[in-house]
Amino acid sequence: MTKEKVFKKKSSILEWGKAIVIAVILALLIRNFLFEPYVVEGKSMDPTLVDSERLFVNKTVKYTGNFKRGDIIILNGKEKSTHYVKRLIGLPGDTVEMKNDHLFINGNEVKEPYLSYNKENAKKVGINLTGDFGPIKVPKDKYFVMGDNRQESMDSRNGLGLFTKDDIQGTEEFVFFPFSNMRKAK
């Protein structure tokens, strides 16, 4: 093999190596700062999100703080490997209260249309979907969350407590698996 062919072969290998390194760096940047896939574990968000569904999470809101009441958010648990998928209910400074299956934020009733299926099922068996609680004043720099499956969810009401902005990993963007059920959860 001539020196020219050896040089071209090494040059070609270097070009492929550069392309692979750039692709890996881009993938890491996208995953760490823009979007990341998550797997729903458990029943706390049924039927909005069901166990084993896979969703993409928009991580940009973690840096912009651009999340709002009603968003489905992914939270870090106390252990690094634990994540929770919950609905953002109370923002810093809010007063959260549940009376007779109606949510009140700062004294104003907040409609929760995403709970209609679960509320109908609870009424069929003669119970409220969500037990009364509060009023709870959400401290500065804290967030109050609940699962949509209020009977099955561990959340800010009953064990998980309140979360900080740093605990929020992002908002649910869309469900991508199973493919037959791709959608934007509401």
UniProtKB/Swiss-Prot annotation:
CDD domains, sorted: S26_SPase_I
Cellular compartments per GO CC: plasma membrane
Entry GO MF terms: serine-type endopeptidase activity
EC number(s) from the headed UniProt entry: 3.4.21.89
Primary location: membrane
GO biological process: signal peptide processing
Active-site residues per Swiss-Prot or TrEMBL entry: 44, 86
Top-level division of the source organism's lineage: Bacteria
Keywords tagged on the record: Cell membrane, Hydrolase, Membrane, Plasmid, Protease, Transmembrane, Transmembrane helix
Residues on Extracellular side: 36-186
InterPro entries reported in the protein's UniProt record: LexA/Signal_pep-like_sf, Pept_S26A_signal_pept_1, Pept_S26A_signal_pept_1_CS, Pept_S26A_signal_pept_1_Lys-AS, Pept_S26A_signal_pept_1_Ser-AS, Peptidase_S26
Residues on Cytoplasmic side: 1-15
Catalytic activity, as annotated: Cleavage of hydrophobic, N-terminal signal or leader sequences from secreted and periplasmic proteins
Positions of transmembrane segments: 16-35
Broad class of enzyme this protein falls into: hydrolase
Keyword Transit peptide: no
Membrane disposition: Single-pass type II membrane protein
Location of this chain's protein in the cell: Cell membrane
Family: Belongs to the peptidase S26 family.
Stated name of the protein: Signal peptidase I P
Species of origin: Bacillus subtilis subsp. natto
